[in-house]
UniProtKB/Swiss-Prot annotation:
The lineage of its organism: Bacteria, Bacillati, Bacillota, Bacilli, Bacillales. It holds the Pfam family adh_short_C2. This is Dihydroanticapsin 7-dehydrogenase. Belongs to the short-chain dehydrogenases/reductases (SDR) family. It comes from Bacillus amyloliquefaciens (Bacillus velezensis). It catalyses: L-dihydroanticapsin + NAD(+) = L-anticapsin + NADH + H(+). The gene is bacC.
Amino acid sequence: MNLTDKTVLITGGASGIGYAAVQAFLNQQANVVVADIDEAQGEAMIRKENNDRLHFVQTDITNEPACQNAILSAVDKFGGLDVLINNAGIEIVAPIHEMELSDWNKVLNVNLTGMFLMSKHALKYMLKSGKGNIINTCSVGGVVAWPDIPAYNASKGGVLQTDAFYRPSIIAKHNIRVNCVCPGIIDTPLNEKSFLENNEGTLEEIKKEKAKVNPLLRLGKPEEIANVMLFLASDLSSYMTGSAITADGGYTAQ
């Protein structure tokens, strides 16, 4: 895949899909910088992986100076930045008529504004270096709205509009590509927590019920989304920009 010695910055990389991506890129001999708000998880990841190619920087992606610092940390640590993966995200379950404004703003600030801030400062570096690759973690919720998570759906719909954010026709001239992946329901710790908080039954029972929504009749694995990210980061996808890959077990094809 030709990712050896490439430097990849992953937001929300200390758990779930992000952590699976960290491991996938390390396996390809890439340098990986994780920007995550959870310092304890980040430090635990560093100890577990014990890899000189991995670096952690505690980052609140809703804070612009913190985002700028994350980009600079990647450049200072490994000498450049080849790939930015905007993966950090949250969801709050509540129908729109019951959702607090503070919760609405929190979701949009992390999922949408955080992506904007990280991309803004990554692009400043990539435009100067004449190359780069941005991968955004969207969601099926940005294509077909999930019930009772209106802020999440709205934020991911914004993420999907890569043309509006990045103007691929302009930045492509500088050898910069931008694409996104739209996962379906993935078996992550964050989703497990949400399942138990918002459904009745055991975790195993809830997972079986959730799996029925797509033709493959199972939840996705974080590693399966990480594999899509590897493809988008590599030369195998060199003719792709402004595209979205849906990995949802066939949910949106029904």
